[in-house]
A protein has these predicted regions:
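Beta-rich ligand-binding surfaces for carbohydrates and other polyanions
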Residues: 1-168
Length: 168
């Protein structure tokens, strides 16, 4: 049986007929995101509407002032409604060494471009709430939605950073 759970995880269950005792059971035989496979941190809403996940746990709430303790009220900062002067009224804060459920590959996004160019593109885009920047290729990937940020493993330190838009 294939099941899609409310948190976005995909499960496969196998029906086992147990000989002798007559108790038959459904057993989970696969989960797309699990401690055995891809980290649960890559589930879009692992940490609710926003948060930083590391080692299968929600550990922080990224804010313009830095990482704060995570709770279920953690959310993206508000951005001003769009008008001609919006770009001047927004800033960005950096969350280092993270990605989300959409892995940023070598050729994903636009570029090469500098971080400031990517900030301008996001500032000019009404739906952009932030972007992911791949440092090794100077690639920019705008995001209209950001939920759980997954901390990258130590071997990927310095590879991808998120820049979150906020109202100054």
């Amino acid at each position: 049986m294939l099941r899609l759970s409310s948190n976005g995880n995909l499960y496969i269950y196998t029906y086992l007929e147990l000989p002798g005792n007559g108790n038959n059971v459904w057993v989970e035989t696969y989960a797309a995101f699990s401690k055995k496979g891809r980290s649960e941190c890559f589930l879009p809403e692992m940490c609710g509407s926003y948060g930083l996940c590391e080692d299968h746990q929600c550990v922080a709430c990224p804010t313009p002032k830095g990482l704060m303790g995570w709770d279920n009220k953690c959310k993206l900062p508000d951005v001003p409604s769009y008008n001609a002067s919006t770009a001047a009224n927004v800033g960005y804060y950096k969350v280092k060494d993270v990605e989300d459920y959409r892995p940023l590959g070598d050729s994903d996004g636009e570029g090469p471009m500098m971080v400031k160019e990517c900030m301008k593109k996001c500032s000019d885009e009404v739906k952009c709430v932030g972007f992911f920047y791949r440092n090794d290729g100077s690639m920019c990937s705008l995001a209209a939605q950001i939920n759980t940020l997954a901390k990258l493993h130590a071997v990927f330190t310095g590879l991808i950073d998120a820049y979150i838009k906020y109202a100054k």
